[in-house]
Amino acid sequence: MSGATLEAYLASCTTHGDELSRDVAAVIQRLAKAALDIRKLVNQGALGTVFNGMHSGSNTDGDVQKDLDILCDDQFLSCLQGAPVACYASEELENPVLLDPAARLAVAIDPLDGSSNIDNNISIGTIFSVLPAAKGPDVDPSQSFLQPGNRQLAAGFFVYGPQTALVLSLGRGTEIFIFSSRLGCFVDAYKSVGIPDRANEFAINMSNYRHWEEAIRLYVDDCLAGSEGPRERDFNMRWIASLVAEAYRILVRGGIFLYPADSRKGYSHGRIRLVYEANPIAFIVENAGGSATTSVDRILDLVPESLHQRVPLVFGSRREVARITRYHVDPNMIGERAPLFGKRGLFRA
């Protein structure tokens, strides 16, 4: 339904008599409305009263919260009041919030991903996951979020950039909607997005090279060696330091994103939050024909141990993601490389 409004698209995906799909559609429409309000705040830039303000507290990761982080979290929580949502979990909150115990859905969200980039006018966004709510007498709301990502009913992210976009998957493909100021709504601009299997771009923060494990170094060395190395073709490197912006680019034109675990304190288990960042991104990417792993294991098969658990994240073009896994698990991938591209690599550790 390319060119359809978000409302029309959701209506087309709602099966007659299927109350669960109607509930999912209702939640997505509420999130979209809240995102448009946040878009207005972000577009004010430094002119906005909450743009640069620092909150006195910190989030679950220990990061100092900006006032805009808190405002966005409040905005999304408020928009889901009265929606068919049993509980709400957020990066900004230590524990889930119970909304309607009788409702069927649970929503996990990163209200303002990339907020450290706000001052630099780089695209930021909101990432969300819609899950079936855990049921049972006296059930702990956190149980709704301790289920593998392959149980997600929907996932998406908003990008607040030159265009305001919604990337959405209901489990049957991935669509990209762009907000039309003329129509006042989101319009389907990229129908059934497909990530190419073959990639010529990779995104990673090269400043951490010395901290990576050998398999990641070797993969990057081979990409940098280009047509003169074992890959026998040239690669470009990208790094925006905004997960939603990186994911959007890969969905539109292919490539691979790597945020591996490394040897720094606090990074040995990765840095991307599984429940409300890695899982929704992986769901979106897989429904666009790509792959998402921890470098070895499929993201969507992981069972979260805690709400704010962190993991390494590699996603994008299927062949490249599979190659990185082979670098980790198949010693022959190292032995078969040309001597110049052996363990030493192009950079000294």
From Swiss-Prot:
This is Fructose-1,6-bisphosphatase class 1. It is found in: Cytoplasm. GO terms for cellular component: cytosol. GO terms for biological process: fructose 1,6-bisphosphate metabolic process; fructose 6-phosphate metabolic process; fructose metabolic process; gluconeogenesis; sucrose biosynthetic process. NCBIfam families: PRK09293.1-3, PRK09293.1-4. The keyword DNA damage does not apply. It comes from Sinorhizobium medicae (strain WSM419) (Ensifer medicae). Its EC number is 3.1.3.11. The gene is fbp. PANTHER family: FRUCTOSE-1,6-BISPHOSPHATASE-RELATED, SEDOHEPTULOSE-1,7-BISPHOSPHATASE, CHLOROPLASTIC. Its cofactor is Mg(2+). HAMAP family: FBPase_class1. It is an enzyme of class 3 (hydrolase). Pathway: Carbohydrate biosynthesis; gluconeogenesis. Binds 2 magnesium ions per subunit. The lineage of its organism: Bacteria, Pseudomonadati, Pseudomonadota, Alphaproteobacteria, Hyphomicrobiales.
